[in-house]
Curated annotation (Swiss-Prot):
The gene is ifgI. This is Fumigaclavine B O-acetyltransferase ifgI. One of its GO terms (biological process) is indole alkaloid biosynthetic process. Its EC number is 2.3.1.205. It catalyses: fumigaclavine B + acetyl-CoA = fumigaclavine A + CoA. Belongs to the fumigaclavine B O-acetyltransferase family. Pfam families: TRI-like_N. It comes from the Eukaryota.
Length: 484
């Protein structure tokens, strides 16, 4: 985000491939001292914008810049006008009345606009209208405050947005501390270090599978056939049990039969993570629901991979802009030819998964792990060079597949500190999804009676597919509801 003399911040190559949409984070605080909290928020946001004036800006498109077309930048106002980025709204009822949804079976199916009234901006703004960088809305309930932060995805990614919330918490909890450094200068130096040396070189790899013409995101229709977003809560012990079974298959590579394995034994990864295994299980279950069959011809998924810790640059770790590259995995569907034999997991619960299905999930998890392992600094430089070499930067974006995974589980949202008046973050939520097949792993929340945090996951699908998904045997088992 290098700042020029005319208060313009040029967005990076990675910013340009992000979805042209707005994302809303909603933080809930249970407090009866809402008036004092609101005044702290107002003072905190004022302080934050002084060290990060980028937040006051709006996005514009430069028709031509340095021989490239349609490069986007942020225009920062140099006057005191148009500096209000916080609005507040009073609701004369308890918080749960506004955050409730429609019960369907065993999960909460949220109507696609059920939380939008809590957000300061819609998810899509026409290109003919002004495009702000970020806005905040303080929703004052009789028993709580819900702080909504809506940000442009082409300026920040999920991790960068969480860092902004952490900075805001610091500004709110103690306005009298030593003044913060001018963060925009730090971001300027970080971007220079991260994206330096991309011009006049050739990409080392082919990126046409994961990057292509920028896909259009259309508003979600609000009829009976529209998309819905459902929040699933998966049991951590069940995920660990499934991970154990997949790891056993991986360890005993001979379980991969020649006619069913697609990864040579020599190329198997050294380990599988819980993220790999849950991604594979959800991808398989959703694809089965969509195809209405136990088997399907092909599975095509993409995943946003946070590159901050993968490119060996300290400047990247605190960078607020987009730092996610797009992983693309297209693989044949399962072939269940073996006996209908179920494998038992450890402890007392039987996992409703057959031998061939376990092999397929392990194979899929191995492919995901191998793809992630290969996304290093060399890959990052190649990807950035590919984007930078495009003549028209508006024509390249992340290719969305049937299933699009993102993980924000690493975000320390529940550890944010806004001060004693606010207390702890009671709940974190998102506005509804815009893309069919969107799967987001939410920040982990560890309660006092859990050794391992459960997995909260947002899934966006047509309502009929979500209804079928919550009835799937493997999904029910992963949620710990197989006995109901």
């Amino acid at each position: 985000m290098s700042t020029s003399f005319d208060h313009s911040v040029i967005l990076s190559p990675l910013d340009h491939i992000a979805p042209q949409a707005y994302v809303s984070y909603l933080l809930s605080f249970q407090t009866a001292n809402s008036t004092h909290c609101l005044s702290l928020l107002e003072a905190g946001i004022t302080r934050l914008t002084k060290v990060l004036p980028l937040l006051l800006g709006h996005i514009v498109v430069n028709p031509e810049l340095d021989g490239k077309y349609n490069i986007q930048s942020v225009q920062i106002p140099c006057t005191k006008e148009d500096r209000t980025i916080l609005v507040h709204k009073h609701h004369p009822f308890p918080m749960e009345s506004a955050l409730g949804g429609v019960q369907s079976g065993m999960s909460m199916l949220e109507t696609s606009d059920s939380k939008q009234h809590l957000c300061p901006l819609p998810p899509l703004i026409p290109s003919t209208e002004r495009q702000p960088v970020i806005r905040f809305q303080a929703n004052i309930f009789t028993d709580a405050i819900v702080l909504a932060m809506t940000f442009s995805h082409i300026v920040f990614d999920g991790t960068g947005a969480a860092k902004i919330l952490a900075l805001l918490g610091r500004c709110c909890r103690d306005p009298s501390v030593t003044p913060l450094p001018l963060i925009i200068d730090e971001q300027d130096r970080a971007q220079s270090a991260i994206f330096a040396g991309l011009a006049d070189t050739s990409p080392a790899q082919d990126h046409t599978a994961e990057l292509g013409p920028a896909p259009a995101i259309h508003p979600v229709p609000l009829d009976a056939a529209s998309l819905r977003t459902c929040r699933f809560e998966f049991n951590s012990e069940r995920i660990l049990q499934l991970k154990y079974q997949c790891s056993q298959v991986l360890k005993n590579a001979c379980m991969f039969q020649p006619n069913s394995a697609s990864i040579p034994v020599a190329d198997l990864p050294p380990f599988l993570s819980s993220n790999d295994v849950l991604t594979s299980a959800l991808a398989d279950a959703i694809q089965r629901v969509k195809s209405q069959s136990k088997t399907y011809d092909c599975l095509d998924l993409c995943m946003a991979v946070n590159m901050r810790g993968r490119i060996e640059l300290s400047a990247a770790r605190e960078f607020l802009g987009n730092m996610a590259c797009n992983l693309r995995l297209k693989t044949p569907g399962p072939e269940y030819t073996g006996p209908e034999q179920c494998l038992s997991c450890r402890k007392t619960h039987d996992c409703p998964i057959q031998t061939d299905q376990l092999r397929f999930l392990t194979d899929l998890a191995c492919k995901v792990r191998n793809k992630v392992r290969n996304m290093d600094r060399k890959y990052f430089q190649s990807c950035m060079t590919y984007i930078a070499n495009q003549k028209d930067w508006s024509q390249t974006g992340m290719i969305f597949t049937d299933l699009a995974f993102s993980s924000w589980r690493h975000l320390d949202i529940y550890g944010l500190d806004f001060g004693d008046s606010f207390g702890i973050v009671h709940n974190f939520d998102l506005s509804f999804g815009l893309i069919e097949g969107d799967v987001i792993f939410l920040p982990k929340r560890l309660t006092c009676d859990q050794k391992e945090a459960g997995w909260d996951v947002h899934i966006t699908l047509p309502a009929k597919d979500l209804e079928a998904l919550v009835k799937d045997d493997l999904i029910r088992w992963l949620m710990g509801r197989d006995g109901e």
